[in-house]
């Protein structure tokens, strides 16, 4: 793993978010280029005895859902997301796009 990613993940978990033992940490990463950082964040959360919950969003897939989703579907998705977020103690979001 690139040492810069290790250093960034450690800083996010231990300094920025200050994850503590048994903290439930929602890690949301967007785009393929953010996977290495997400993986390292999981390791760092476990290292401080936190509990990671990882979610990946791929914008092109989301677009397909949103192009055809019903109002009811969107409301249910929002309710489910809200309930899960309410159960978390910490949130770390990572956004990235393909570098083409």
List where the protein language model places each region:
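Active-site bordering "gate/hinge" segments
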Residues: 1-100
């Amino acid at each position: 793993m690139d040492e810069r990613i290790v250093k960034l993940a450690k800083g996010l978990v231990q300094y920025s978010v200050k994850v503590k033992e048994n903290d439930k940490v929602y890690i949301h990463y967007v785009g393929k280029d953010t996977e290495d950082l997400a993986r390292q964040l999981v390791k760092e959360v476990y290292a401080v005895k936190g509990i990671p919950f990882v979610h990946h969003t791929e914008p092109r897939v989301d677009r397909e859902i949103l192009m055809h989703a019903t109002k009811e579907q969107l409301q249910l998705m929002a309710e489910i997301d809200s309930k899960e977020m309410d159960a978390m103690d910490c949130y770390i979001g990572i956004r990235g796009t393909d570098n083409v």
